[in-house]
Amino acid sequence: MSLSGVPLSAGLAPSPSNKPTNGKGQNIVRRSGNYKPALWDYDYLQSLPTLYAGEAHVEKLNKLKGEVRIMLEKTVTENPLAQLEQIDTLYRLGISYHFQDEIKALLNTIHNNNNNNNNNDDVYATALEFKLLRLYGYTVHSEVFNVFKDEIDKGFKAISLCGDYVKGMLSLYEASFYSFKGETILDEARDFSTKHLQKYVMMRHNNNSKDQSVDDDDDLVILVEYALELPMHWRMIRLEAKWFIDVYSKRRDDMNPTFLELAQIDFNLLQSTYQEDLKHVSRWWSTCKLGERLPFCRDRLVEVFLLAVALKYEAEFGYARRLLTKIGVLVTLMDDIYDVYGTLDELKLLEDAIERWNINELDQLPEYMNIFFVAMYNVVNGIAYDVLKENEILIVKYLKRAWMDACKSYMVEAKWYYSGYTPSLEEYLENGLISITIPLDLIFLYCLTTSPITEDSMEYLLQYPTILGLSGTLFRLVDDLATSSDELKRGDNPKSIQCYMHESGVCENDSREYIKNLISETWKQMNEVRVAKSPLFSQAFIESAVDFVRGAMLLYQKGDGFGTKHDGDAKDKLVSLFFNPIPTP
């Protein structure tokens, strides 16, 4: 089998007529997704100026990194809270990845001295330490919060809403999202802190009151409102950095100008790198002419690229981001072929063609499937060729199997649609964690970023281990909460919300609450996998699986940011991340 690229014109069957028929002379009625066109066209993406590329900016970045390293080394060891606050600030500014060794050294000391800590009566310090230790994979027990519970009624102690207390409640709230299954004390902490933070916000906004019982720092209420909207642990790192850089720059007392300048330059440099990536993938998209030949599909190049950035945001992973974007675009096309456009007979033909994986046997495919198959064949085989050169292992058969699994899961849903079948929630999710194609994307990520690659590791990936399943399930549920109403309007299958309604006889609002709770519970499982050391996967790969879900939380936070409502909140976030640099002096 050749791994060389095949021209997109190869094997394309001529269209028998302008109107598709089912082989019996009857016209086929196609559904429509009613998708809006792309927000950014080829000319716009190619015109991006990449203002912050160049050696001068890199030299400035490296100089500032050196200064920050010195600061971290000089942090007073007798003040672990100051160390924790520095680490937290670096993380939120999006620059902690430059200082992993220094941060690990500081946290090792803090973790080893846990028995001697003096934070037992400080909810802010205790929660901050707990959050950061779990964030960086340390073993830390939730019982540390028992000291803040009332000995009589066993609930958390209530104190007046002074500024320091609100900081403590915010810290407790953020820490609670790192909980594991069965840690009821963190469930209680989340409920308790949420209630008090909501009360604090109401007090601040009540006639713009600045009562003496409430802290007068506007920065604090901004942080609280932002956290209540979505906790930091669930947010995409790069976009979180852009938002926090702006907030941090306005602080009066505890702003570190070196941290700020480094974060600004780092963000702009990465943005320029992303712009070059976008130029590359937009040229590929234009050359393939897939958008022209498959006009019924979503043209979501930039949105797909966002998810590639969520997976690997560092500058050195441009090769992986570009290929992951191509894979994501092809997956989007396949999703629309199966969900919207193709008939059952056509879908079976495509499935058979992927099973054969032979460019010379496409005669039975409709024309629109021909061009899709050849584009997919070229990209997948190109990745396999690169892996063969670097790792001396031929992985085409594994990539084909992964793609086939996705096709089979799509076919299950197509059959549900045509038969009018509503599955149970368990049945839906068992299939849906594959049909969302997150495991497929993660398998490609593994191949693009791992060396060496072995036959055993590929076989293990295709058994869909826990980390792939959790990432797929979370993405599926988050997607469904945002998109199910729009998809039902065009006649799609019931999603998780409707499956649970049908199964349990509850109303839609109750079903949505159940799915939200299921998302929270699944995150707890993800948290446990994060801190468990895998013998087969690097911690970086596991973090990428978590980051994929964070990308979903961004796209679907306020509606279908990938489909029918991609010109709303999601658009603003994409513009902020990819097209608007941070002004610097």
From Swiss-Prot:
UniProt: Mg(2+) 1 binding residues: D335, D339
CDD domains reported for this sequence: Terpene_cyclase_plant_C1 (cd00684)
UniProt-recorded Gene Ontology molecular function terms: magnesium ion binding; terpene synthase activity
Record GO biological process: diterpenoid biosynthetic process
Transit peptide interval: 1-31
GO cellular component terms, A-Z: chloroplast
Signal sequence bounds: none
Keywords of the record: Chloroplast, Lyase, Magnesium, Metal-binding, Plastid, Transit peptide
InterPro entries: Isoprenoid_synthase_dom_sf, Terpene_cyclase-like_1_C, Terpene_cyclase_plant_C1, Terpene_synth_N, Terpene_synth_N_sf, Terpene_synthase-like, Terpene_synthase_metal-bd, Terpenoid_cyclase/PrenylTrfase
Pfam families, alphabetized: Terpene_synth, Terpene_synth_C
Domain-level remarks: The Asp-Asp-Xaa-Xaa-Asp/Glu (DDXXD/E) motif is important for the catalytic activity, presumably through binding to Mg(2+).
Name used for this protein in its record: Probable monoterpene synthase MTS1, chloroplastic
Organism (species): Humulus lupulus (European hop)
Organism placement in taxonomy: Eukaryota, Viridiplantae, Streptophyta, Embryophyta, Tracheophyta
